[in-house]
């Protein structure tokens, strides 16, 4: 399909070209300045002397402190006793630094022995947190911001960073519904605020990016911005929260090389629990008789199944027992006080658990981050990343393959005695053959992301900062699908697809920070532009011969399908921030942003998003001095503000046309045009956020507690309300909804040192609940097999179904009880509540709101132990309340008149001798109509507790490694997802996020080992 903008949004493209030119100019400036500066810095001094010294802090030697000669790359590091030696010029200046301490410059002045005493770096110890367009000390934060420690990422056999973040932060809801190679878990912050996209904004080094392509080993810090105070600076796309990622930077000192390696094997955490073949045969006979049919299996056949006959779990046969996974990461950092760098390479190889030729996911990462201090007040920074992910999979649909395998009875072998694939009577599918011989689909994605930043300190405290960056994403898809005779796939298919997107971002900011007595004042004023463009083309061809894996020939005809699209948008913004604190006790902050977006028509393009927050560090008051030994820190804070959401399709306020091949004349296809519904009055969704919280430190701040409660209300939600059929087109989008989301968060951390043993404990729990406030009185019902409703007074996307009321126990109950329209129930069938009391169960009259699948009471806790080089940690994560509507062959015996499946829980079915069963009487075909109705009987309790990761490691003593010229060496063993506790029936994973059919690639359990080494 080709989409064109009839009104030609020229201003978006004009701004895009202007910003791109600015980006090119800054790139040239960076290259010139770096070359001039590097070339001009020549170090030449005479009178070289040998200097020895010792670096101390708090009466103890500082191990590994960096000692550099100012202005050059000459340097060393202190040994186990804090000693160093260096040949320097007699008039040189030494720059001594170490993490957690203030950097000191020490003139040599001809001395041959120098003692250096480092002072604690107060800012470092009090923790700096990355926020929008800057950093702040954590103690002075007035917004709801959480940080994910990089310790959470280490030693875990993960394919993307989101898997490691799950359960680490309150209010951060991550669901890993599948471990499909290359897939990324879903992410949400503080629940659902809208009927549209609820994904948070992800910013990587100042550029919008993807967490799925990021190498976890490159990450320095992750900040989760959750309230208006912290997100309003991002304005129109911040209503769902913001994830800020800062990657590692270079540091002055000797070159340090790090290498990380991990190897593991994957196994499915859970698979459908299919009944054994002899049990299946017995229950099949019972279902057939209950349905007025003859029994199929004789007692002799059943005995044969029991005594060594076929007993095959077709779903299990789709997967390898063990599938390898490995990763390699190498990085190099170094530099001096003027230029520092960090370069890294990463490789991830995740084989598919599916059987088949060479399926899996490969990711290649390369990064270069450079910081160059051109002069004392002018600095240039470069961050750059290249990522390629290569996904190779089967050419069909995973849902289809799993569906057909799940429906296959265990009485049939998956292969015949001659090795050919078995197609039992009535079946047109063998999932294993589709995997092994059905062709392949390959997606190759390339991402190039980079930022150039120039920072000029015009005057003490006054800085001018300019940056430009971009992201280019290319996707190339190639598919060669092979047909199988008699399976319904009689023709081979070749597909080629290309997609490219470009994103350009520029920022210009002025910042000012000063301190006057006890008054600390800060300000920021900025301008930002972002432009995006994309285009896509695809073509498919049906062929008679599958041996050719290239796309050649005529591109038109009834066996060829072509399509394409293109779009672009732009947004430019002004923003400001003002901060004030008095003696670090009374804290104030104000943010505002004005966005101007091409998503909306003139007159509606501007959106203004302010926020205000305040905090009070009660523990810094004089009257608190008596309590200070018991409660050393206490802060209360609150915030209020507005943020926006413009995540709708482009051009929806304009009249657009779609052109496609719609009518066939002989062997030629004629093009047809479709005009979309429009609404020129569209405007921003706006979310009002309110938050109040406190932070409490006890036991000398070894025990820290943080609590927040919040209330968000979104108005003018962009939604397609139903329209009458006479309208003649799809419903136009309009601002017609309101949703309120309420919730709370609690996190606790505790550090305990008992002799040589250090214990670390962290835990968090949170909840959010949303309620639809207004849809103009309209109910929006969606879904087919699983139906949901958007209705005033209830959560978004609530399940909408009949409410079950046990089973009919006898004929009298069947005659007197309510029944589905047109169906006469029998004893053992599900009985439904008659909502309006007319005796007939009908969709329009008798459905209830019966649950919701969004997770509530999400929690996570970790325990870590360190003892003389040994370390152990475990991380648990779970959900306290969630419903999951399972359907089809995932729960129904003999679903849709198929031969299977029969699950383990079907054995506890209703019979006259088992009236208190958990499953209705067994039936098949038309006799199943009553029980197969959409009701809460099929909704399961999906709360769970899962051990996400456990690992044990050992770090070798430095005195051992020093002889091998190794700075640090750690070896470890780890397991991901080893244990799950859940009430879900049938072996289905409680994190499953699909449509309820169970047709999903499983979550993986991974056993691994690895090492971390630094030189």
Listing of model-derived features with the role each one plays in the protein:
Residues 139, 252-312, 352-447, 467-572, ...:
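Surface-exposed loop/interface segments of Gram-negative outer-membrane beta-barrel transport/assembly proteins
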Residues 1-367, 379-381, 449, 684, ...:
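Short, small/polar-rich motifs associated with maturation and membrane association
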Residues 331, 760, 852-880, 932-981, ...:
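Conserved C-terminal beta-signal and adjacent last beta-strands/turns
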Residues 358-372, 605, 609-615, 967-978:
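Short secondary-structure subsegments characteristic of cysteine-rich extracellular domains
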Residues 247, 259, 276, 330-336, ...:
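Residues on the lipid-exposed face of transmembrane beta-strands in outer-membrane beta-barrel proteins
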Residues 173-177, 232, 619-626, 960-962:
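Active-site phosphate-binding and catalytic loops of NTP-dependent enzymes
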